[in-house]
Amino acid sequence: MLIPSPGGGAPTGVEKPALQVRITGAILALIARFLSGASVRWIDSQPDTCQRVYFANHTSHLDAIVLWSALPPDVRTLTRPVAAKDYWTAGRVRHYLATRVFNALLIDRTEIKVHQSPVDVMIRGIGHRYSLIVFPEGGRTSGDEISEFKSGLYYLCKKRPDLELIPVYIDNMNRILPRGEVLPVPLLTCISFGPPIWLEAGEPKTDFLRRAREAVRRLKEG
């Protein structure tokens, strides 16, 4: 479990989560895979504990959980979903799951400060050990079309160009937990992990975001 420093900055070290937390995480991963019936494809890439940014399309509140649960346990332990603080702190159960089980990196969408931008929070939160799960569309979409990517992914990679970027396409999640619904409907989904990309030296923001979005779109069509 990642332990923040007293000032809320970078982690002070990597500690194994308590047995209860590990068991809870394993059970939730099994439940998520059962409800989604998720099949997992790795296309020209393999699971790895190196630092990565998994960037995916976003249609459901369950996206982060299902993607996280699709990773092998050793990779999952080192991967932090980026999540909305207002949603995941609304209630004790959500807060416990986000902070203790998923080790989520919570972003405050209501009070963004210049010295504490979401990108800076992510940079501090991963240090030189953790990977991230992000959704560059910036919010959930209601259909199958992948929206234009927001600029956060570009600025994250500009500050950490060494990070390996893995495109991910999550299929059918908007039908498992439609927008506005509370209970999931058991259906089959597929999670496709694509080949890694990197921000190239001098690559313009618009070109990079278009290329990253295209990497996810190709997985959808494949």
What are these regions (language model features)?
Residues 1-8:
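Soluble, non-transmembrane catalytic domains of enzymes that act on hydrophobic metabolites at membranes
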Residues 5, 96, 131, 143-206:
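A cross-family acyltransferase "interaction/gating" segment
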Residues 14-37, 90-103, 177, 181-186:
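Alpha-helical membrane-targeting segments
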Residues 20-21, 28-58:
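Helix-to-loop junction immediately C-terminal to a conserved catalytic motif
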Residues 46-111:
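Catalytic core of membrane glycerolipid acyltransferases/transacylases, capturing the structured
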Residues 50-51, 77, 128-130, 163:
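Short coil/turn segments at beta-strand junctions that form active-site/ligand-binding loops
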Residues 84-88, 138, 170-174:
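Short beta-alpha junction loops
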